[in-house]
Amino acid sequence: DGGVTITYKFDKGGITVPVTYKLEDDYLSASVKTSDIKETKTEQGIVTTQLTMLGSFGAGAPDEEGYFVIPDGSGALIRFNNGKETTKSYTARVYGRDITTVPTTKPAVTEKIYMPVYGIVKKDNAMTVIVDQGDGNVILNAAVAGQSLSSFNTCAFSFQLRGSDTFYMSGDYGNLTVFEDGAIKQPEVSVRYYPTANKDASYMDVANTYRSYLLEEGGVTAKAQADTTEMYLDLYGGCMKSRSILGIPITLKTSMTSFSEAKEIVSGLEAQGVNDMVVVYNNWTNEGISGKVDNKAKPSGTLGGSSDFNKLTSYLNEKDFDFYPSVYNVTFKSGNGYYTFLDTTIRISNSYSRQMFYNLSYGVQDTNKKTLSLLSPGTFSEVYGNLASNYSKAGLKGASLGSLTSTIWGDYGKQNMGRDDTKTTLQSCYRAVKESGLSLLADTCAAYAFPYADRISDVPLQSSGFDVFDEDVPFYQLVLHGIIPYSGTAINASADSHNAFLTSIATGCNPAYDMIYAEASDLKDTDLDSYYYSHYAFWTDTAAAAPEAAYIRSASDSLHSWLISSVMWGATGLSIFTSASSSPRVTLPLA
């Protein structure tokens, strides 16, 4: 019942690691209690920083057919022996990098791993590998034959037991890498291996296994309703903008979408037949606009104040549209009871974590913009406890916490919190929001937030597209389809909006759009200038037609049981045909 424990000794490093293997009804588990790891040469600076268990388990032979299922973004496949020995092997941290560290050059823009799982698929079998404990500190590695001085194709998780940071030194000393002090924070790490026997095994088997794990042991309950399609609409209220007053440049809160204008946008869509809508309102409070910690739920006077806000919420309630006022409490400025010299996250290098902006041309720090302080996870319980209370008092029914449902980081100062500690704290915050009666919309939701999310927005439609990948698959969507309703990334944010729309409905996503009332020219030199594409008048007609087209997909609960037979461009727009009719099922107007 207790399994078997095998002790691995690394005499040169003075490290001993006992690993417990246990065979259950449908899986094999490998686990390590980190308190049992013995380190005898710590005084010499030798400590355990990373741990890989069963690194070659399920490896593909040089003459074997099969592939790895990688949950990068929407999902990707790496086929065995794909001849890409000269490309970089795959390595990525689950839930993204620890943003506490601040690189001097801009990191590559890639998708994240949102689920601590990978799959190995061969001709007549598959294996699903799931991190059961320690998912906040795990890295996924994959390499095809020839990439890692091995003739085998391998994929495995590695646990980062101690985080690292860099001291940037001047002169001839170079940069110094420093690691976390003290004992390992993560109490236990555990991985499960679920085998599946299937004559025609595929990544669908991996998705189904992980889906069952979430429903049976991950605390996830089905919330999606069959045969419904909703439009997800992101509105952006205000921002800080520099104006010249008597020749003096002054930065003021400026409205880009007031509460009355938001009502106008929504009512315009409703008038064109959009009957199911999920509305997310960003930057709707003074704190949200100015970048301070935002938890008071007080509508900004710049956008129309409480009177106009109440008119908006009354209208949305009357139309039965779901409303999620959003907050973004990742970086912050002093104010509202939180101060940068007290509440900023401390890096492993013992310095403040100041998030910098990067020059678009060269990727180095943009010195024309001030750095922003990263909010300490030690404040989260208070911040979101107050937010839940204030949202309820304001009569709101939903909340969006921004990227706090997909991003985790540690605080290595007095708080002494690792990433997994932050994950646990965030889950208690989600519970506080739910227990106050609020519905929670998760922005690009990571697995640790699945049990608490009522809806998910901004689901990735593609992978990072690394050279070692062979093709993208909708793995994320397959796992969640029929469990939690979700939307894809904003269709109008794409350079090819028509292709983005087709990809969205093909992967089972509800259509999503970003909209701002102000003209694109008004956004210049503001924090909202990246939404230059989102002027509402340009997209209203196209967006209004999208839910009807997406209904083709939602008419069946199976993601792959419908068929778009052809797509045709015409003078009026994009026509979508199905196998059931010779007439267009829907036509999207040209945008």
Label every PLM stretch briefly:
Residues 229-314, 318-382, 406-410:
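Aromatic-lined carbohydrate-binding/catalytic grooves of carbohydrate-active enzymes
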Residues 1-256, 263-277:
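Carbohydrate-recognition beta-sandwich/jelly-roll modules
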Residues 196, 200, 252-255, 302, ...:
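Hydrophobic alpha-helical scaffolding
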Residues 32, 269, 316, 402, ...:
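Conserved, mostly hydrophobic/aromatic
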Residues 120-154, 183, 332, 336-396, ...:
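Active-site-proximal substrate-binding groove within the catalytic cores of carbohydrate-active enzymes
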Residues 273-277, 319-323, 395-397, 436-438, ...:
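Short, well-ordered coil/turn segments that N-cap beta-strands
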Residues 54, 268, 272, 315-319, ...:
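Structured segments of extracytoplasmic/periplasmic soluble domains
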Residues 8, 34, 55, 281-283, ...:
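Glycine-rich, histidine-containing beta strand-loop boundary motifs that form or position
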